[in-house]
Amino acid sequence: MIEHYLSQALIGLTLAIATVLLFALAHWRSRPTLPLPPGPPSEFLLGHSRVIPKENAAAVYAKWSKEYNSDIIHVRSLGRSTVVLNSADVARDILDKKGANFCDRPRFTLLEVMGWGKTLTFLPFGQRWQMHRKFLQTSFSNTNVRRWHTLQITEARRTIQNILKKPETWETSLRRLAVAIVLQVSYGTQVLEDDDPYIQIANDAMYATGNGGVPANSIVDLVPFVRYLPDCIVRDWSLRFARQWRWAIKKLHDVPFAAAQAENVTHHLLREYKDKESRGQEQQWSLDDIKGAAGAVFIAGTDTTWATCVIFILNMVLHPEIQEKAQQELDAVIGSDRLPDFSDRPALVYIEHIVQEIYRWSPLAPLGIPHKSLHDDIYKGMLIPKGTSKAKVSLLLVQAN
């Protein structure tokens, strides 16, 4: 009996050693002939797994960029390379000028577990990605967005009235403003009160999405089959968090969609879907696709609008001299008997610059959604391997410099 267990243990040990050796051989054979971008020291087999930041990643990558005197940083974890772009110039060179090679996305398994499926931001390059992208580009072209100007003006003035009535709830009023505009555009549904249930739906979805870890960098992203294992085996907080908060993403997709009214960006998709369904024709858009497209608009517009308004107010409080100059420009352009509208925007140059400075001073998403390369690429003598994820630190170092 003892000999049997010893034999089984020896076989297991042999297989483990063989696996490690094969992995090491594959790693050695895959070594690039050109240098990779600089980065922190790596460990054998593990690479940078133990140093890749799980929290406040943008600040850590910015620190490494200064430490290694490079606007492009490379890290590797369990065989997957990630290149971090730390300046606007490098981002333009790689993501814009070479966009055809870097248009793909890595698979976001963790976000799939959370409920983000057919949403453009997280889709890999392919037919579905092209379909979603074309729809959103058409819906929000420079011409089409003008039809929402009246809605934006109405909601902005309603927000001002709410703040005048209850100045202590100004932040909640701004949250309602953001949700009201995006929900009307996406689903044709009105949000009139500061305590509307849709505001909590948006808050829950944003919390779930923003607090589950760095996209494409969790254990389940690196080893996708882990998603099928129970928490007692995996013991990964990000996977457990995604499972616990899946309800919030499902609610974001299902509740507004069920109450959708006419005259919104997804209305014609739903109408086309029902027409084809009644005729028994093949569907290009599934219901999940339509929900995903509407959800992408909802999640992208809600938090960014609210955060920009809050940061604007913060800066006006901190810099009253800037606020005074902005007020002087408003008085000069529109006087004191009316409120501004979109026709006044070209003349409000100083206020436009304030808004642009807010974008620069406090980027709303310091760490952008990763891209993935379709083929090997060479940038300034450095190799970016095929399948590499690119995370762009949005203007983080530009503001620091």
Residue ranges and their predicted role:
Residues 43-45, 73-77, 81-86, 120-122, ...:
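Conserved, well-structured core segments
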Residues 41-62, 81, 108-187, 200-258, ...:
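Cytochrome P450 catalytic-domain helical core, especially the substrate-recognition surface
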Residues 386, 392-401:
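Conserved cytochrome P450 K-helix/beta-meander segment immediately N-terminal to the heme-binding cysteine loop
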Residues 38-41, 153, 200-207, 263-272, ...:
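Cytochrome P450 I-helix active-site segment
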Residues 91-96, 192, 397-401:
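Cytochrome P450 core scaffold surrounding the K-helix E-X-X-R motif
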Residues 2-115, 131, 153-158, 370-372, ...:
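N-terminal membrane-proximal hinge/A-helix region immediately C-terminal to the signal-anchor transmembrane segment
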Residues 85-88, 186, 256, 308-313, ...:
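Hydrophobic, repeat-rich solenoid/adaptor surfaces of innate immune receptors and signaling proteins
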Residues 178, 304-322, 327-329, 395:
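Cytochrome P450 catalytic-core helices
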